[in-house]
Amino acid sequence: MANFNKVFDDIKDQVGGLAEKDLKDFSSQGKQDADTFLTQSRSKLEKWMQLLADKKIDEDEFRWLVESQKAAAQMEALRKANAGTMQIEKFRDSVLQIVVKTAITAAIAAI
C-alpha cells in the first residue's frame, strides 16, 4: 500500500486548499477544524486504508466507515467564528469526500 504518511499529507493539503477556496474569511478556522478532525481520526483512517488495500473491506465499506466519523468532525472553530451552518456542513462533507477519494485512489494504486 502507498505510504500512509504521504497519503495523509496529501489529504491535509487538499483540505487546506478547499478551506481557502470555499471558506474565504473563515479559511484559518476551517483548516484548524479539519486538522483537528484528521489528527483525531488518523489511526482509524490508517487501519481502514490498510484493510481496503488488503481487500478485507470494499470501497463502499470504507466510505461508510469514513462517513461514520461525521459526528467527530465538529468544526468548533468555524462555529465559534459564526460561519453559517450550511457552509460548515458543506465543508465538513467535502473534507470527508476528500478523505474517501484520496484513500481509495491510493489503495487502488497499491493493488
Where are these regions (language model features)?
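Cationic, hydrophobic amphipathic alpha-helical membrane-interacting segments
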Residues: 1-111
